[in-house]
UniProtKB/Swiss-Prot annotation:
Cofactor: a divalent metal cation
Assembly notes: Homodimer.
Described purpose of this protein according to its UniProt entry: Catalyzes the transfer of the AMP portion of ATP to flavin mononucleotide (FMN) to produce flavin adenine dinucleotide (FAD) coenzyme.
Keyword annotations from UniProtKB, A to Z: ATP-binding, FAD, Flavoprotein, FMN, Nucleotide-binding, Nucleotidyltransferase, Transferase
Pathway(s) where this gene product acts: Cofactor biosynthesis; FAD biosynthesis; FAD from FMN: step 1/1
InterPro entries: Archaeal_FAD_synthase, Cyt_trans-like, FAD_synth_RibL, Rossmann-like_a/b/a_fold
Record GO biological process: FAD biosynthetic process; FMN metabolic process
Protein name: FAD synthase
Family: Belongs to the archaeal FAD synthase family.
Amino acid sequence: MSGPSKGRKIRVLVGGVFDILHVGHVHFLKQAKELGDELVVIVAHDETVRRNKRRNPINPAEDRAELLRAIRYVDEVYIGSPGGIDFELVRRINPDVIAIGPDQNFNCEKLKEELKRHGIEAEVIRVPYLYKSDRAKTTKIIRRIVEEFCE
């Protein structure tokens, strides 16, 4: 990474679904923020969630974005486009660092190649697990809710 020009803040970008916000999300956002000065989040579009997770999101993208805006580590929030990574949006955000969550299904090297192909120069960093438990997994939280309230 060549780094930002003198005086420019280091901008960190993360993306994700962030459905049923939980402590694991908060720890990830905190760790990502510590990589720079500004933290920008791209929330997955509802169609993207349906395609990738094969289920509807519990909360619509607008609600997930509003919740993320309320977290002190987050400076800006965008809702992504339906489909894959919106490289045009990433280019506009102009991140210095892209932080990948510990359980996000991304190959960092392939992502770096894709970014380069789209003319985006950013360091890609996988954030390690800080808080690993069933309380920090959305699917396990949903399962517990179903078991507790639906059976």
